[in-house]
């Protein structure tokens, strides 16, 4: 077996650092500062390695957020490949709950100018992912007409405002309510359902 090259090792180290930081942010109490020495230890790298990849705490936080956005966006077509549109959207919303928790932790630790810029740049790709899911749902007659990505982003943005004490009890149930709200009515689903000889399949 060919030994890993230094470049591959560096990529692996970077990925482990990002994952360890993400886990730490998700598990942290409100206002708890991300401890870089703990991140390095959890990732199995030295602090020097961490600082070579991320010279400042802000650099690491920004990369954690960007990584989460990339994963969230890529997940939409992956879920549609193996699930019905409504199930894909429900599973995507489940991932949104995790993303929002990390986003809140990242933004709380960054200067306002930084997180506002990050948020502005992520809205487009996330909106595109939502559009893919909504269009698949409408094509199947499962999502109501007139709902667009901006509507969904507005509805799910409440997650970043939930108190930590309410998170486990409210985040996913509230997303389920959002999903119910954008689904087509039973009558509309029947009209949009595939048919055989005029009868729903």
Segment roles from a protein language model:
Residues 44-54:
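Short hydrophobic/aromatic patch on the recognition helix
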Residues 86-201:
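An extended, acidic
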Residues 10, 65, 69, 119, ...:
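Amphipathic, non-transmembrane alpha-helical scaffold segments
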Residues 20-27, 71, 75-79, 155, ...:
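Solvent-exposed, amphipathic alpha-helical segments
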Residues 11-22, 33, 52-77, 87-90, ...:
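An amphipathic alpha-helix adjacent to DNA-recognition modules
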Residues 1-42:
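Basic, helix-initiating cap at the start of DNA-binding domains
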């Amino acid at each position: 077996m060919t030994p890993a090259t230094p470049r591959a090792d560096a990529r692996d180290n970077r990925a482990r650092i990002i994952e360890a930081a993400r886990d730490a942010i998700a598990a942290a109490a409100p206002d708890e500062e991300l401890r870089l020495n703990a991140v390095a230890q959890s990732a199995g790298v030295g602090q020097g390695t961490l600082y070579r990849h991320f010279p400042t705490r802000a650099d690491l936080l920004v990369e954690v957020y960007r990584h989460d956005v990339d994963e969230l966006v890529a997940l939409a077509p992956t879920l549609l490949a193996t699930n019905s549109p409504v199930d894909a959207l429900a599973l995507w919303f489940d991932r949104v709950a995790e993303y929002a928790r990390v986003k809140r932790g990242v933004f709380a630790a960054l200067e306002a100018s930084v997180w506002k810029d990050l948020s502005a740049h992520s809205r487009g790709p996330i909106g595109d992912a939502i559009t893919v899911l909504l269009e698949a749902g409408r094509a199947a007659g499962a999502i109501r007409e007139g709902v667009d990505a901006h509507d969904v982003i507005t509805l799910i943005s409440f997650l970043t405002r939930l108190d930590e004490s309410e998170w486990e009890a409210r985040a996913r149930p509230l997303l389920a309510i959002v999903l119910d709200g954008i689904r087509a009515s039973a009558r509309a689903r029947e009209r949009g359902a595939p048919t055989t000889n005029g009868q729903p399949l």
